[in-house]
Amino acid sequence: MMSTLFPALNLNKDEPLPSFTVSELNDWALITMIGADKKSYLQGQVTCDVVSLAQDEITFGGHCDAKGKLWSIFQLFHHNDGYALFQRKSAIETELTEIKKYAVFSKVDISISDEILLGFTGDKALEWINQHTDSNANVRVSKFGTFAKVSDTQWLLVTTDDKKEELLSLLSEATLCDEAIWSLHHIKHALPQIDAPLCNEHIPQALNLQAINGISFKKGCYTGQETVARAKYRGINKRAMYLLSGLSEARPCAGDAIERSVGENWRKGGTIVSAYRFEDGHTLALAILPNDLDEDTQFKLQESIWEKVELPYSLNDE
């Protein structure tokens, strides 16, 4: 059911994006972690360095099984008296089960938060946040809750129902709209995510986690580390996530197959991670593809030809 408070924003490909939007992020959720052993427990579970994470910083990370396959990709930050892991809701029940698997041996409480998640997007979102917070850090505590910087044009606010009402009364400058605009910014920044169809299918490097500082190769042991390290040092990873552009009749979904050209034929080429469809049919998508394809390789999805778009970051190892 469409929200009347956060209506759909119907954009065409060549339209400028709104300079300031606020959306309720119903397709996202938080896992929170508190307790005396929270830091050491999480450090042994995830790809990022929890120990070195400053109070006012945020980092990408992944949680893998013993074979290095991802249960989830998240952004981790300090929240209240513990940690928050911001990630896709469709896979969060599976992720909760997996990340709690060894918690019985530690003083740690792990749960899915019932807090409200609001997404602030656009070039002027930061101006508003600066006016209503006392910090210029990437994670800020305010009277409305915790603000966390997701990308240069995206900020997350973790808040509550009663604070949300007061907040909305102060947002006259913002366009309130549904969370599709958040997805568009996420895709333009080529930020990875794991929805249920991709759960436990790929190693972190297949979703470019190393390129956005989501993997520490200097920290101690964690679940799946051996596979992740081999992918870096022995070159066993054969996939990466790319940004594609094409036309579609309907928005592609996570897990959809995309074909690639091989001579004059087509064969399965990869898997959709996320997509945004403009009103005129133009569509941007992130897809996991072989990382050794020729530059002139074409792709086909929904009987339409798609092409690569340059990523906003480099995939080359340092």
UniProtKB/Swiss-Prot annotation:
Transmembrane segments: none
Name of one Pfam family that matches: YgfZ_barrel
GO term, biological process aspect, one: RNA modification
Location relative to the cell: Cytoplasm
GO molecular function (one): folic acid binding
Binding site for folate: W28, W182
Native source species: Aliivibrio fischeri (strain ATCC 700601 / ES114) (Vibrio fischeri)
UniProt protein name: tRNA-modifying protein YgfZ
SUPFAM superfamilies: Aminomethyltransferase beta-barrel domain, Folate-binding domain
Main location group: cytoplasm
Similarity remark: Belongs to the tRNA-modifying YgfZ family.
Superkingdom as given in the UniProt entry: Bacteria
InterPro entries: GcvT/YgfZ_C, tRNA-modifying_YgfZ, YgfZ/GcvT, YgfZ/GcvT_CS, YgfZ_barrel
Keyword Acyltransferase in record: no
